[in-house]
Structure formats: structure tokens, C-alpha cells
């Protein structure tokens, strides 16, 4: 079951987001699991598993194994576990949700595959994209961004807080979650529009518990 409260502070990450950690692949995997547990203890409201980028795992078996370990941690702390893009993996793991982008499978196809077994989040980068699927009950929420400049989506044009405002003003009732360059310093600007999703605000933080606390306070 989808509860919009889980969008308050979503941590999005994969092992590639720990590129600053010395060592190899296993060190990055361990760093992700450690950071996730700390973030869960500090009360993030959901976790999205995202393997993308130069240092992302490539072997499907390794990806599934890591996803499973992340899912177990989420279950331990009672937080929803969401898989980014990989619909088949999300179904195999019986994840709580799956998040897809505009470049992925057609949203109608995702809905047909999921058969309401897990909730679906959809990334939108324009008002038109949001309006086009506003009527689809199978889409639980919209991910909107990048709101601010970000390292993890260098190729994407920044849409700014303006897009959140446009979507809200258009009468769209679906819950929104903002992503892209969000920090404890700018999170409060987004509070009236919905939840926030962060990567580096947690992965790069020296004190992850403190970072989560500040984000929650401002979200």
C-alpha cells in the first residue's frame, strides 16, 4: 500500500554513489550498506535502490544480491524499499515500489507488468509530461527534477522550483517528490510542494545521522 508520507525524505543510492571511498567495488558496497543502515536509524522515510553510472555494478546477480541486502535493512526498520528503473528486479524481490523515468519503458507497460502489486513513481521533467499521465491511477507519485544543479544528473536540464509550482498550480493532485541538488540548506524552499529525495546530501555527509536530522527538520 502506498502512503504519501513515505515521500518526506527518500534516500536514493547505489554503490556507485560512494566513489569517494578508497578501495574497490566491495568497499563501495559496504559503504552503501553502512550508510543505509545509519540513514534508516535516523528515520529516512523511504529508500530507492539505484544502480546507474560509471561505477555501478554490471553483473545482474551482484545487483540482485545487493538489492536484497538493502531490502532486508529497509524491512528491519519498516521503511519502503523502491527499485529504480528495473521493473523486473522490483517484481522478483517483491519490492514495495518501482520508480521509472521518461526514457524507460512506457508507463502503461510498467503498470501492466506491476498489476498493482507495487506502487509506481514516475519522473517528470516538464508540466506537459505530468499533465499527460495525471489521470493514471496506477502512478502513485511524480518525481520532479533536477530542481537544483546536481552531479548525479549532469546531462539533465535544471527545472527549478518553478516546475513544482507549475505542476501544483495546474491542479494535479498526485503527490510530488523533488530531486536534484537538494541539501539541508535549500530543502525548506520545497516544503510546500511535497517530499524530497537526496543522494549526495547523505552519501557525502561526514556525519550521516546529523545530515538526515537536518534534512528531516527542513523537509
Swiss-Prot record:
Q: What is its EC number?
A: 2.5.1.3
**Binding residues annotated for 4-amino-2-methyl-5-(diphosphooxymethyl)pyrimidine, in chain numbering:** 48-52, 84, 123, 153
What cofactors does the UniProt entry give for this protein?
Answer: Mg(2+)
Gene Ontology CC annotations of this record: cytoplasm
- Give the binding site residues for Mg(2+): 85, 104
Catalytic activity field = 2-[(2R,5Z)-2-carboxy-4-methylthiazol-5(2H)-ylidene]ethyl phosphate + 4-amino-2-methyl-5-(diphosphooxymethyl)pyrimidine + 2 H(+) = thiamine phosphate + CO2 + diphosphate; 2-(2-carboxy-4-methylthiazol-5-yl)ethyl phosphate + 4-amino-2-methyl-5-(diphosphooxymethyl)pyrimidine + 2 H(+) = thiamine phosphate + CO2 + diphosphate; 4-methyl-5-(2-phosphooxyethyl)-thiazole + 4-amino-2-methyl-5-(diphosphooxymethyl)pyrimidine + H(+) = thiamine phosphate + diphosphate
Q: Which pathway is this protein assigned to?
A: Cofactor biosynthesis; thiamine diphosphate biosynthesis; thiamine phosphate from 4-amino-2-methyl-5-diphosphomethylpyrimidine and 4-methyl-5-(2-phosphoethyl)-thiazole: step 1/1
**Cofactor mode of binding and number, as noted:** Binds 1 Mg(2+) ion per subunit.
| A Pfam family it matches | TMP-TENI
Q: Name one GO biological process term.
A: thiamine diphosphate biosynthetic process
What does the protein in this record do?
Answer: Condenses 4-methyl-5-(beta-hydroxyethyl)thiazole monophosphate (THZ-P) and 2-methyl-4-amino-5-hydroxymethyl pyrimidine pyrophosphate (HMP-PP) to form thiamine monophosphate (TMP).
- Matches recorded under NCBIfam families: thiE
Entry similarity comment: Belongs to the thiamine-phosphate synthase family.
Under what name is this protein listed? Thiamine-phosphate synthase
Q: Which species?
A: Helicobacter pylori (strain Shi470)
Amino acid at each position: 500500500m502506498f502512503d504519501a508520507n513515505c515521500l518526506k525524505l527518500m534516500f536514493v543510492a547505489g554503490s556507485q554513489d560512494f566513489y569517494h571511498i578508497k578501495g574497490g567495488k566491495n568497499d563501495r558496497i559496504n559503504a552503501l550498506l553502512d550508510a543505509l543502515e545509519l540513514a534508516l536509524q535516523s528515520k529516512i522515510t523511504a529508500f530507492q535502490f539505484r544502480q546507474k553510472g560509471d561505477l555501478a555494478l554490471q553483473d545482474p546477480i551482484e545487483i540482485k544480491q545487493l538489492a536484497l541486502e538493502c531490502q532486508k535493512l529497509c524491512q528491519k526498520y519498516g521503511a519502503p524499499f523502491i527499485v529504480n528503473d528495473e521493473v523486473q528486479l522490483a517484481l522478483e524481490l517483491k519490492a514495495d515500489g518501482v520508480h521509472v523515468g521518461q526514457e524507460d519503458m512506457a508507463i502503461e507497460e510498467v503498470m501492466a507488468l506491476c498489476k498493482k502489486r507495487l506502487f509506481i513513481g514516475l519522473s517528470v521533467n516538464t508540466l506537459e509530461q505530468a499533465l499527460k499521465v495525471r489521470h493514471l491511477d496506477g502512478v502513485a507519485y511524480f518525481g520532479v527534477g533536477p530542481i537544483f544543479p546536481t552531479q548525479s544528473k549532469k546531462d539533465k536540464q535544471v527545472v527549478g522550483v518553478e516546475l513544482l509550482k507549475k505542476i501544483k498550480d495546474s491542479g494535479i493532485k498526485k503527490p510530488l517528490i523533488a530531486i536534484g541538488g537538494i541539501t539541508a540548506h535549500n530543502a525548506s524552499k520545497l516544503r510546500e510542494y511535497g517530499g524530497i529525495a537526496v543522494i549526495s546530501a547523505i552519501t557525502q555527509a561526514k556525519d550521516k545521522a546529523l545530515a538526515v536530522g537536518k534534512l528531516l527538520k527542513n523537509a
